[in-house]
Amino acid sequence: MISENLGENQTEKIPLKGRTLKELSEIMITLGEKPFRAKQIYHGLYVNRYETWDQFTTFSKIFKEKLEELCSLTHLQVVKQLKSVDGTQKFTFTSESGNGKEFEAVWIPSGDGGRKTICISSQIGCTLNCKFCATAKLEFQGNLKAHEIVDQILQVEKIVGDKATNVVFMGMGEPLHNYFNVIRAASIFHDPDAFNLGAKRITISTSGVVNGIRRFIENKEPYNFAISLNHPDPKGRLQIMDIEEKFSLPELLQAAKDFTRELKRRITFEYVMIPGVNMGFENANKLVKIAKSLDCKINVIPLNTEFFGWRRPTREEIAEFIALLEPAGVPILNRRSPGKDIFGACGMLASKS
């Protein structure tokens, strides 16, 4: 486990951000240090939010010089920051190596100031081609490492001067195609000795990677889970989501049922509303049948990426569709779309300004 993300050659420093406490302990032992040093570093990184070895004032000069030589506190570079009229802020990052690969995170405060969500990315670009998502139009440039995922939170919170109450893996990329690094980062967010976010305040989303869902179930991951459904019919779903070719809707729904049965937790279906594509009575009726078959809630989201040739539904169309879903007897949320003016809303992350 220690060798994960060490770099391409032995001359590169060991990145310490994005490591669990257990991993840090193993690294310290490898470096000939006592395991308790790991807890000091862990606390310094995630509680005190130190960014340089000089800030670890309890460390001896010799120990700090050793860490400086062998280990890295690498952090992301913010190359662009945009603020919406509604208070949403979008951050475009690149890694410290300056490789030019950009990815984004979004700070989303609620209107009353109580809920503060950070939407983070798990990949640069995406491996999938969802027709309603701007990220799908980007070239896939790789998975983000755990320290690059964790540092999105650290950098955003530092800049806005506030702490997030919720974290959602709904930015660029398919989280379950980067399972190891996503779960490692989520465990750090959840750890009481690090970010101390409750498991119910961390949501991992997927477009429907069934083998990843089954791995999630097998590992009994404690986090909230959302599936980007977007169409209640296999043929219709295939037209807008290419993942349907690999993991069919029946397979996906069976995995969702297994999730609720095994983990005893409600699953969330995300549903981007596209007029003429997945709305109307017939689609609503099929979605109601799906919802009745398992313990779930439905988040409906008006289409934001109008530049794909579709239009955003009107308020009347949204209200009518939600009314058609009410017989399902499950919670239905019309999810707001903050940050549209800065291309920070759902489906719009593509390093655009």
UniProtKB/Swiss-Prot annotation:
CDD domains (alphabetical): Radical_SAM
Note in the entry: Reaction proceeds by a ping-pong mechanism involving intermediate methylation of a conserved cysteine residue.
Protein residues bound to S-adenosyl-L-methionine: 173-174, 205, 228-230, 304
Function noted in UniProt: Specifically methylates position 2 of adenine 2503 in 23S rRNA and position 2 of adenine 37 in tRNAs.
GO cellular component terms, A-Z: cytoplasm
NCBIfam families: rRNA_mod_RlmN
Disulfide bonds: 119-346
Documented EC number(s): 2.1.1.192
Gene name for this UniProt entry: rlmN
GO BP, one annotated term: tRNA methylation
All copies of domain Radical SAM core, residue ranges: 112-341
Stated name of the protein: Probable dual-specificity RNA methyltransferase RlmN
Molecular function, one GO term: metal ion binding
Record's keyword annotation contains Metal-binding: yes
Keyword Metal-binding included in the entry's annotation: yes
Reaction(s) this enzyme catalyzes, per UniProt: adenosine(2503) in 23S rRNA + 2 reduced [2Fe-2S]-[ferredoxin] + 2 S-adenosyl-L-methionine = 2-methyladenosine(2503) in 23S rRNA + 5'-deoxyadenosine + L-methionine + 2 oxidized [2Fe-2S]-[ferredoxin] + S-adenosyl-L-homocysteine; adenosine(37) in tRNA + 2 reduced [2Fe-2S]-[ferredoxin] + 2 S-adenosyl-L-methionine = 2-methyladenosine(37) in tRNA + 5'-deoxyadenosine + L-methionine + 2 oxidized [2Fe-2S]-[ferredoxin] + S-adenosyl-L-homocysteine
One Pfam entry name: Radical_SAM
InterPro entries: Aldolase_TIM, Methyltransferase_A, RlmN_N, RNA_MTrfase_RlmN, rRNA_lsu_MTrfase_RlmN/Cfr, rSAM
Top class in the EC scheme: transferase
Keywords (A to Z) from UniProt: 4Fe-4S, Cytoplasm, Disulfide bond, Iron, Iron-sulfur, Metal-binding, Methyltransferase, rRNA processing, S-adenosyl-L-methionine, Transferase, tRNA processing
Cofactor: [4Fe-4S] cluster
Residues of the active site: 104 (proton acceptor), 346 (s-methylcysteine intermediate)
Family the UniProt entry places it in: Belongs to the radical SAM superfamily. RlmN family.
Residues annotated for [4Fe-4S] cluster binding in this entry: 126, 130, 133
Cofactor note: Binds 1 [4Fe-4S] cluster. The cluster is coordinated with 3 cysteines and an exchangeable S-adenosyl-L-methionine.
Localisation: Cytoplasm
